[in-house]
């Protein structure tokens, strides 16, 4: 579960390395986000020459969480880190590459471009 002030690694080549959650989108007073949810975040670490700079406010979708997610068949999927991918308004990623595996739940949220760019879908 991702909440306000949570720091996440960025799993794309948009130029950001780490982001800090400002707000979880979707509903009034929503506290937590899980895999496939959209957040508003601030870039805390960035690589030089990237598309996004330190201090930029961006939207991102969560692709990996340590807490994990329960699937319809009763199984759980968990990862070793919390990670997100920075997206545009049309739900397409800002970067051109995705690093590391992503969860299958992104397919249900309409993030097909992220799923197709990912090296592995679990």
From Swiss-Prot:
Q: Which Pfam families match?
A: Ribosomal_L14
GO terms (BP aspect): translation
Note the SS bond partners: none
Q: Which UniProt keywords apply?
A: Ribonucleoprotein, Ribosomal protein, RNA-binding, rRNA-binding
PROSITE patterns for this protein: RIBOSOMAL_L14
InterPro entries, per database record: Ribosomal_uL14, Ribosomal_uL14_bac-type, Ribosomal_uL14_CS, Ribosomal_uL14_sf
Cellular component aspect of the GO annotation: cytosolic large ribosomal subunit
Q: Which GO terms describe its molecular function?
A: large ribosomal subunit rRNA binding; structural constituent of ribosome
Q: Which CDD domains match?
A: Ribosomal_uL14
SUPFAM superfamilies attached to this UniProt entry: Ribosomal protein L14
Quaternary state and interactors: Part of the 50S ribosomal subunit. Forms a cluster with proteins L3 and L19. In the 70S ribosome, L14 and L19 interact and together make contacts with the 16S rRNA in bridges B5 and B8.
Task performed by this protein: Binds to 23S rRNA. Forms part of two intersubunit bridges in the 70S ribosome.
Q: Could you say which protein family the record assigns here?
A: Belongs to the universal ribosomal protein uL14 family.
- Identify this protein by name: Large ribosomal subunit protein uL14
* Underlying gene: rplN
